[in-house]
Structure formats: structure tokens, C-alpha cells
Amino acid sequence: MTFRPLHDRVVVKRLESEEKTKGGIIIPDSAKEKPQEGEIIAVGPGGRDESGKLIPLDVKAGDKILFGKWSGTEVKIDGQDLLIMKESDILGVVG
């Protein structure tokens, strides 16, 4: 199935969380927090201003981003756990 987000929404795949701490302690699945970093899979065309002019998004597919803990809506597409969120939920692009 293909999915194309509308307006100023983006589809994000979470990056895998760390299995170990820097000190070498293994973190069990039950203690892991969901990562707040992901990769953009797809972007919508953008939002519109008051005059109806299309405003393109600042992010593109392939960008690695940071987002808030409670950002987005979790969905499952083709067996992949993904997030759909507005561009305004994105905190920044990781360079």
C-alpha cells in the first residue's frame, strides 16, 4: 500500500533505540523509552496561507529529525510502525 500525507503532514519512521548505555549496561525492552528521533519517509505538499498560496514544507524525505515525546499519531502501514505528524511537531533536523 502506498500512503501520501496531505497538507503539512509528514510520515516518520522512528530510529531504533539503543540496546546498551554508554557504560555497557543492557537496557531491557520494558525499560526503553520510545526514541524521539526518526527519519522522514514521505511529506505532504504543504500548507496554504490566507490567500490560498501553497507554502512548501522545510523538510524532505530522508531527513533525520527530532520530535516531541507526544508528537504524532502512531499507525501501522505494510507492517511498519510509523508516525504521522504535522511539520510544526518537528523540533529540528539532525545534520
Swiss-Prot record:
The protein's location, in the record's own words, is: Cytoplasm
- Note the InterPro entries from the entry: Chaperonin_GroES, Chaperonin_GroES_sf, Chaprnonin_Cpn10_CS, GroES-like_sf
Task: Provide a GO biological process annotation.
Answer: chaperone cofactor-dependent protein refolding
Per the similarity annotation, which family is this? Answer: Belongs to the GroES chaperonin family.
Listed A to Z, the keywords are: Chaperone, Cytoplasm
- The primary gene name is groES
Q: What is this protein called?
A: Co-chaperonin GroES
Q: What does this protein do?
A: Together with the chaperonin GroEL, plays an essential role in assisting protein folding. The GroEL-GroES system forms a nano-cage that allows encapsulation of the non-native substrate proteins and provides a physical environment optimized to promote and accelerate protein folding. GroES binds to the apical surface of the GroEL ring, thereby capping the opening of the GroEL channel.
